[in-house]
């Protein structure tokens, strides 16, 4: 509320006070004359002393009209001084603006989500949205109340529809469907993850993570349906955060390789993922396994990450989930250990510093795999894999306010022995943009081209049986992901696939143009 000392109301109050004072003076008259004189003399002395102490005050006093009382004179001088100070400040600001100087910095406000951000899941290579970018944020104070006792959480649901738009596409019964989109395909993936802060007990960055995942598919080979855990983990750091340790039931697809385009799972439900990593035994959300991950940071950018995990089933993802839908079993049939090692260089975008992530990894698996050239012979346990990937920001569209916005490019190369793996090579080139338009600063656009190369041994074996075969499957996809509001993403994608089936095909299913629509909502 602003109070105007020169308002009519204030003037009325002073009039009443003056009338009351005048009546009192008429009654008491000369009795108080001596006091009035002494009071006026005292006020005059104060004014002279102040004038001598300050040349500026003297000049101001010399320009101020004489008042009837000492108190009124002091009030007038204070108001005049404030007015001059304010005028000087405005003049200085105006001069600064004319020469292009920036205004004085404003003290930053306390971010209400800063404390909540400390409870986000640690040790991941992908960027799950923070509490501020969720649908419920901190409504009702529920997140803040849980944070007081060290608990954080995130939940999300991804719902996707895929359908081949080509007019001559060969449809089939659901039971005989051979690829996602051959018939209209729908699937839903739902997650709930809770963290507990152990740093309150003196454990550096200590955290316990517990998560569950539920999925349903109209095309079961894409899944299958399941309800179970996706994470039960313990995390902490050592040596002033130079060393990270994470152990438990993990999903390494979020911790190694960086297969999600742009690093945001909410924006990448269509991003092509190679089977090389999964057929090599890497665990992921629907198929977590016991894992120990140790990361050493040589400096702020260079790192090495070592992972020892129980391999998923060597017979494939479908076989693993069918045998262990809850994810709690220690192992599945014929599964052994998978050793992964990744070295990388990574720096995040900053004003004038472009985002860069280079990584390369190798894996060795002693699970018992079927020999593709001789399936009837005893299984062997000498499988391996490798990958090399890079992502680089080419241009920053908003350097100072949001350095991560701009245009990016990247590539991935992966491989595995053709005698034990149906996919022996995988190549990917990607171009994507974050916040390309000022009116849509959180949207993402991606264009991705891939080539999946099948094992020569597997292709030759299928051709020997009289099947039509293809030695690779090429695809190109474009996706636009709109950030519609806190925690709400919607994606539209179009993917052309040359030979969408695995190795064998018929002339009617040699090509596909899959339309995809998806929503991702984070809570």
Model feature map: region roles:
Residues 509-523:
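Outer-membrane beta-barrel "beta-signal"
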Residues 2-5, 15-16, 34, 46, ...:
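N-terminal periplasmic/intermembrane-space "pro-region" immediately following the signal or transit peptide
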Residues 159-163, 212-216, 249-253, 308-312, ...:
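Transmembrane beta-strands of outer-membrane beta-barrel pores
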Residues 348-439:
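Long, well-ordered mid-to-C-terminal structural blocks that present hydrophobic/aromatic surfaces
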Residues 130, 136-153, 165-166, 195-207, ...:
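Short loop/turn motifs that connect adjacent beta-strands in outer-membrane beta-barrel proteins
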Residues 183-314, 421-461:
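Outer membrane beta-barrel
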Residues 155, 191-196, 232-236, 292-296, ...:
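Residues on the lipid-exposed face of transmembrane beta-strands in outer-membrane beta-barrel proteins
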Residues 151-157, 206-210, 243-247, 300, ...:
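Transmembrane beta-strands of outer-membrane beta-barrel proteins
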